[in-house]
Amino acid sequence: MTARFNHTIIASSDPQKMKSFYGDLLEAAEAPSWGPFQNLIIGDGVLLQFATPPGDFQPQHYAYLLDDDHFDRAYDLIQGRGIEHWADPQRMQEGRINHEHDGRGVYLLDPSGHYLELITRAYL
């Protein structure tokens, strides 16, 4: 396989706020922004672009694989900022993390209402 993931546009009600939120949570690197895009770079050089679409948008699910130390820092940030979070995607186990797939995981909403999942072990 030679295909690799390069970039995605994440629909945002406030691109600058989203850039700040994701930058803090994912410890993402600053990237030059242009036009309607506020940009960050995460692992493997993947570009996250935040932009406001012309109309309404449906929430999406984005999962990020973190190492254990990064997960600890991200979870401390989530708790420190009082961000509502859950151990499960159905949002039944509020304020908890899970221990699925021999790792840890947590679900939360970003400022534009997208579902984020932070995990320490890949599913496959």
Where are these regions (language model features)?
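Short, charged/polar surface micro-motifs in flexible loops or helix N-caps
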Residues: 44-47, 55-57, 67-72
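Core segments of cupin and vicinal oxygen chelate
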Residues: 2, 9-47, 54
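Conserved beta-strand in the GNAT
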Residues: 48-51, 107, 116-119
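Hydrophobic adenine-recognition pocket in adenosine-nucleotide-binding enzymes
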Residues: 8, 62
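Vicinal oxygen chelate
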Residues: 63-115, 123
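Short glycine-enriched loop/turn motifs at secondary-structure junctions
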Residues: 2-4, 55-59, 99-100
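A short, sequence-level motif marking secondary-structure junctions
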Residues: 52-57, 123-124
